[in-house]
Every structure is written in structure tokens, then in C-alpha cells.
Amino acid sequence: LTSLDNVKRVALNTDGLGQSVLLKGYANEGHDSAHPDYADIGKRIGGADDMNTLMTEGAKYGARFGIHVNAGEMYPEAKAFKDDNVRRDYNGNLRYGWNWLDQAVGLDSIYDLATGERETRFDDLEKLVGTNLDFVYVDIWGNNTGSNDDDSWQTRKLSKEINSNGWRMANEWGVANEYDATFQHWAADLTYGGANQKGQNSEVMRFLRNHQKDSWVADYPSYGGAAMMPLLGGYNMKDFEGWQGRNDYDTYITNLFTHDVTTKFIQHYEIIKWVDGDPVSAGAATNWIPEMEITLKDDDGNKLVLTRGSNNPDDDAYRERTMTLNGKIVAKGAPSRGDRTDADIQNGRKRGTESYLLPWIWDSETGKKVAADDEKLYHWNTQGGTTTWDLPEGWTNLKDVKVYKLTDLGKTEEKTVEVKNGQVTLEAEAETPYVVCKGEEGNINVTWSEGMHITDAGFNGGVKSLEANWTKAGDGNAEIAKSQYSNPMLKLSGDISMTQELTNL
């Protein structure tokens, strides 16, 4: 349920953008424990009850949840582990897999499929979580730990077992399971695997399916070729809950508004035209043909056009992108490089030049368009400063708009900005998110630490929550401080104690 508080924190910081949350360690004792007992939801982290609370309450904030499973290797503590389904070579030797907890042993995937045992284990999980679960991420599938050939036939069968329970399919390798997978870890986690593991770079595939999945080569210029500022962007996976030691919250938010908001905005439209440029040398890729202009439309006929600034990778304008929606500019400039390090982000180095004012007209829970009064605009200015924008239709007749700076406590620092001739002029701090509304708007309603024994266990609610939920004794000082990675903590100084009564024990 700590993850539920993190969902709420991100919801406040993004004013309710959708979230996709992968629960790496939902089973048994945590990550990779007791594979492949899919229904063994970890008791010490709350079991099925808390997991369902996380998913049902998180959905109210636009979050969808998936789990990490394995169908190619298993661990001796698993109930599914037995002599009949271990993978052996022709000499009877075990085929070993990953080794960082207990030694993983290959799970004979042909046996698991033919006997129906794997499908039964997924069905057992479905009885516990139903469609509260959104997707299943199948780790390592395709490296032939479970069979001599994890071929397309086997893969489609595995996908159908997962899809039949109402769950999306996701995989690890960048090119895995093109037909069914909607997310590939190594495509999106850009530091994984090197340039040849960065997802699917077929123009035909992306033309047809860009709006359907996160499987594409994203912006990571040091890889060259398709990774040098793709016009369509690409999901750049960062996080702050500890995977690979990543725990910097502010870096996560900066990355999200630098790369992922624009990528997800574009994915609301379908590609109808793709214009290529002339062949160039782009990093390690020779005779690379960059996309120069891409046109997209939605079901209502709204037209989005993306244009590259130059055909020459040695020209700074190669990274510059202009987006127009129905003829009005909604984004311009060069996004900060996707291979920028966390230290670069933390210290404000190597910033790009992109700024945007993107209309956001979709409900994060349902995906449907919101009422006109609930439409909003996200503003981001990488360098900071003042920019002037043409407002979209439905906004031009307003007298003024309300502008809010977004933080992990929600909308702050309300400003009223006049609308002149259908335009608005915005002043922004560098790499700081803002939301523009048609009128005054309150914050998302949040109750911290639902289902837990302490209210606001992570001190996410700021000073007001501290004062409301903790009793102070003594003359010292209690305050909320941020760690070096921007995660809130209680800081006590002087003669003081803070107490809160535990509940529901």
C-alpha cells in the first residue's frame, strides 16, 4: 500500500495523468521469488486483499497495474516445481537460469503448455485479482531457457492464456512478441542492452501501431540511427521506487514531462502520412533515412503534424521538432537528450530547448474525452522564461485562464493570466510542470495510507498532514524535509516527540 501512496503523489504532481505501474515483486517474498506460482501473492506485503486495494483505489487516480512473472524458469521453493517439468539436456543435466536468490532452473515450457498447468496457474491468479490487474509482464521469454525454441507458436499460446483473463501481454526483450506485447522492457528502459536491443524500428510497424504500444526505439542519441530524436518520441522508462537503485523522485518527474507526456500525447492520434528525408550517417548508422514529417489524426478529424528542423544530424536543428495541432503550434524546440544522466538532470545540465502547451482532453481512468469545461493544457519550458501561445478552439473566447505550478502536493501558486487575441503568454521556471485550466480548480482529493496502520506513513502530505495526524510534545521542532533524492522524511530537532496511534491491529 506504500505504492498506492506513491500513485497518489504522482497523480498530484501531474494533475491526474495516467500511470502504468509494474509490480516487480508482488509474489511470495518479492522479486523473482517462487516463480512460477502466479497466485502466491506475498502475504507479508499484504496478500491479495491489499493488492486488490492497491489496484482498485489506484484506478481512481488513473493508474493501471501489472505484474512480473516467469514462464521459462522456476525456483525450488515454488509449489509448481517438480521433476516432471524441469528442463534437462539430452544427458539429463538441468538447464539453469538466473542466479541471484536461489538458483533458477529451466521450466519445460512445452510440458507446461501441453499439460495445461501454466494456464491453470494463470486462472488461479485470475480468481484472486480478476481484471483489477491490467497486464502481465513475462520475464526472459525468448532466451530459450524453457525450450530449444521459444518460437512464435509457443509465444502466441502464452499470449492467449494471458489475454483470455482480460490482461495485456508485456515482455522483456526489445523485439519480443511483436504481435501481442504492448510493452517491451528493454525497449523502454533505455540503458538496458545496448543499441541492438532498443525495440522495433520498422517504419511500417510504427506507422500501423504507434498508438497501440510502447515498443519503439526512443530518444537515446548515443545509440545513433532511429534513437536520434525520433519525431514520434518514445517511452523513456524511469522510476523512483528502487528498481536498479533508481529512487530519485524529481528526476522521475523531470523525465516524465521531458519525454513521456509528449509521447503519450502523440499516441492519442493515428499516423496517416510519413515523409522521409535523404540518407545520412547518424552515429553508428550509415545510410540512415530520418523521418522529416509525420501527420496524424484522431477520430474527430483533429490533425497533428510533427516536423523535423533539419535533415543533417550534425546540425542542432536535427533534434528540433515542431508540433502543430489543427494548424496551431503546441510544441517547439529540441527535447533534452534521452541519454542525459540523472546527475545531469539533478544539476540542470545539458538541457534542451523544447517548450510546449499541450491540450489534454482525455480522462485517465476511462480514456474517454472529458467535458469541455474539464479540458486543460500542460505547459513545460525546458529553459524557462516567457512564451506566447495560440490557444486551441474552445479557449479563445475566454477572458483569462488559471495557471498552476505542479508539485507533489498538487496545484500551487495560482495565477490569473489574461487571454489576448486568442493567445496566452506564460512565464515558467526551467524544467517545471504547469497546468492551465479554464477556471479555478482544486486539487485531487487524497487520503494518505488507506488500509495501513499509520496515516500518511511516508509523510507525503506535507505540513498540513503532519499537523493533522501527529501529536507533538516538547519544545523542539518537527518538519518535513526532503532526502537527497527528493523523498519526504520527518525531521526532528531539539526536545520533541511526535506520536500517532496505530489503528486496525
Question: Predicted regions span which residues?
Answer:
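Active-site-proximal substrate-binding groove within the catalytic cores of carbohydrate-active enzymes
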Residues: 1, 71, 78, 85-105, ...
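Extracellular glycan-recognition surfaces and repeat-rich motifs
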Residues: 460-492
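Short beta-strands within extracellular/lumenal beta-sheet-rich domains
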Residues: 365-367, 384-389, 491-504
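Aromatic- and glycine-enriched glycan-recognition loops and surfaces
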Residues: 1-79
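Beta-strand-rich interaction surfaces with strong enrichment in secreted/lumenal proteins
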Residues: 377-378, 424-425, 487-490, 499-504
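Extracytoplasmic/secreted proteins, especially bacterial periplasmic and envelope-associated proteins
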Residues: 2-5, 9, 49-53, 117-120, ...
